[in-house]
Amino acid sequence: MFRRGIEVETEVLEFRYMEATEDLMEKFGDNCQKVIKLSRLRYAKDSFDKGPIVLTTSYLPEGDSFLFDYDFTKASLTTALKEHQKNRYSMEKEMTALVLGGRESHLMGMKEGSLAMLITSITKNDKGQVIDVTESIYPLERNKFVWKLKL
């Protein structure tokens, strides 16, 4: 967000180990039994009353326990990974329209059934190993999406 000129305030909702789902095992590899789950609500600075601009949930390998040394209300996940030589080399993003269910609409301060954009990112290192899987839910009425492509 900062790179796009948006200052944000972050609220950490969940930061813990959890059993990997089948979907996460498929992405991280069959040896992945547990992952670290980091869920955050992000608000535009000084706009707390307007509601969050994104609900982001990141899943990282169980071995990345160094992450628990960080305060993610202030620290950047990207910076924490770089500081531990977890350099992002490639990223795949999938964008899907989403109708907010009860939990998400409550967290986002929106009506159930409101529209959002779900962006799922899979980040890999230069060896093709998955560094993180992140699901970000952006309510459409609070966000604008612009793609600039060179042809």
Could you say what each language-model-derived stretch is?
Residues 1-6:
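Short linear motifs at protein or domain termini
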Residues 9-151:
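C-terminal all-alpha effector/ligand-binding and dimerization domain
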